[in-house]
Amino acid sequence: MQTPYQTNEAGHLSIGGVDANELAQRFGTPLYAYDVGAMRQQMRDFRRVFEERHLKYAVSYASKAFATIAMYEVAAQEGMHIDVVSGGEIYTALRAKFPMADVSFNGNNKSVEELTMAIENGLGLSLIHISEPTRLRCI
């Protein structure tokens, strides 16, 4: 069975060509390390499937998985949209200067403050609870 995991000549896990043991020694543990090259390739692969078929599309990164300025910068560079689920993720997207027209605010239990933040910054909204239109009228 083939896996996306690579080992180096020392038999250690290699992340983007870097020895994971060396990363742990340098930065301590627990440590989150991502292979940005592999992530970029996956983003391109998703987009290519739609482009080859000449389909109108938007591929969104579900930022609840990992919401940082650096991650949003990579997503923007690769032509991705992002899906946010909290005011904190909206704030991070703003700090990353992510194009707000490419951000969708999803999720349940959105506060009036979060909805206001989303509207004021031009985000798309996914309303999934019956009370959300009522909350929108308060804004």
Region locations from a protein language model:
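Single conserved hydrophobic/aromatic residue that forms the stacking wall/gate
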Residues: 128-139
